[in-house]
Amino acid sequence: MNKNRPNILLFMSDNQSADFIGCYGNYEVKTPNIDMLAQNGMRYSSAFCTNAMCSPCRASVLTGLMPSAHGIHNWLDDNLESQWPDNWNAIGEFDNFPSKLKEAGYSNALIGKYHLGKAWKSSDAFDHWITFPHGHTKSFYKNKIIDNDKTYEHEGHSVEFFTDKTIEFIDDKKKSESPFFCFVPFNGPYGHWPSIKGKPVNKFAELYNDCKLDTVPREGINKRVIDRFSNRILESGGSLPEQFAGPLLLPNNKDSIRNYFSQASLIDDGIGKIIEKLKVSSMLENTIVIYTSDHGFSLGNHGIWGHGMAAWPSSIHRPSFNIPLIFSGPGITKGVSEALVSQLDLANTILNLADAKKLKGGRVDSKILNLADENSHNRNMLFMEQEESRAIRNERWLYIERFNKEGLNYLGCELYDLEEDYDERNDLSNSASHKNIISSLSIQLSKYYDKFSEPKFNLWAGGSAKSNVSNPSFWKKAWGSKWETTN
């Protein structure tokens, strides 16, 4: 094994807010292994994703680009795969951090959910490739698997399968002279129907039989959720997959919420097994372990169930965007950091830890986390977007701006004072005394997207999106009937 460069193990969960992990303060969801990882490393309390949908976030993590730069504004819809080019990789035209690791001598593995195009062949500089052909999880069981050059169906739970395959990969690397990067994007806890509909049947089901769900807010459904559902009905012609009913039905389905909790514990269990494998293989002391999620998930906060696009206009409230982020390993200080962190920071931070060349370019907005100092980070604001909604967040303010154009219904903006209103309940956007603050934040927002967006993918400037958007009729109304998505 190369002692000069550490192995890097990146865990990513699917649809998990920091709120639903033990070490972030949740006393109902049992995650002892993630909690131990945090105890032995650096936990970031203010880490945020770029977009609260699967595919855009995964693309941002790998490339260091915002959705308006890489062009993926929504989850890539599996139902449209027949329209995608052969072997289509949605970020294939961009540089990515695994390719920089490979140039530095790393052996790269992806073991888990990909959701960035056609997955039948390995891409993005991964040598070892075990994934699904699909992005959405309809069930955790009986899934088709792509295992390098083989395909087969696996009967058991997919999280346990990816755990076992990661352990096999580590076993295979014990005597290797080159370091490895292993990306393990689990496809849970997920949170959508039909995968979590009803009582759980996994090994942690009984753990939550009597869970009171006191950490789940009890709020009425937000009107914006109903508006989103109505839009989906209109866009689809009246027929919708069952998963889209979840935001309306989850509030009264305790079995599904307990199911979601159990899937989080199953991921935690897998992480514990993988870390134990590193330990008994004498590899842990030279491995940096990272835990994060693609984006958050709202379990009733503000009356929203799901994530960003569960509401219309989209929600950019904290539960959908605040992600867990934990680093543990050699050279990393133990502690808790309140520094503002974007998932865009992951790419160059990992490359820095590996002493590899950084991602560069006019659209790349990756900074480097100082993992030796819990209070040192050079980002004093961060940016988020969800198609028609864009936001700037700093230590004091969250300002959300909506796309506005003549002929469209005005969707409004939102302003929250985070010092006085952590839960983002009191919208100050109509306050006369806050007009100057809104003006200043709006200017900063515009300047950022002028610099870090790619015109052809900037929806607010008439650009397009790859594969699909959530509300195509909205963008056709904005830019004309000839406006289309692209591949």
Question: Where are the regions a protein language model picked out?
Answer:
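Active-site segment of extracytoplasmic enzymes that catalyze sulfate/phosphate-ester chemistry
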Residues: 10-11, 17-96, 100-106, 134, ...
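Short, solvent-exposed turn/loop segments enriched in Gly/Ser/Thr/Pro and often Arg
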Residues: 13, 23-27, 42-65, 73, ...
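Metal-dependent active-site segment of extracytoplasmic phospho-/sulfohydrolases and closely related
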Residues: 33, 231-232, 236-239, 263-304, ...
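Substrate-binding rim/cap in mid-to-C-terminal beta-strand-loop elements of soluble/periplasmic
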Residues: 62, 135-152, 272-276, 280, ...
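Formylglycine-dependent
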Residues: 73-103, 107, 115-214, 218-261, ...
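Histidine-centered active-site microenvironments of extracellular/periplasmic hydrolases
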Residues: 122-125, 132, 194-200, 277-332, ...
